[in-house]
Amino acid sequence: MEKQKMRLIVASNNANKLREFREILGEQFDIVSMREAGIDADIEENGTTFEENALIKANYVMNAGNSAAIADDSGLEVDALGGAPGVYSARYCGRHGDDAANNALLLHNLKGVPAPRKARYVAAIALVRPAHAPIICRGTCEGEILNEPRGQGGFGYDP
């Protein structure tokens, strides 16, 4: 008899994010979206760090769905901007998810800053289970900001 997989709710309805979680964890877990778990919420990300925001989302979904949950938060930190846009990366221009405007504002704010304009992409993931301590991981990818967008087919700060 095949062992039943533990249900893991992803604190997102983003199809690309769900696909990635299913590709990585689908053999070990039954990965479901918030929508599939019957959770209809716009969770306020009011933490001051990526880790706090991931934990806020994961805890909300765990409590609403009475199941293990996983959430992530990520963004760009630019040294010359004191770490901005940071946790506000997706809404840096004032509107959530306007990638072109976020990139334009970032480049505007870096005008006159000489190379190398050091930056890093930060991603935090929180895994929570009822009656267990949370597991929180953080990863970074170092780089620098160029003078203009380059490439195609990307998203966010990778156009």
Protein language model regions, located:
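Anionic-ligand binding patches
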Residues: 2-9, 15-159
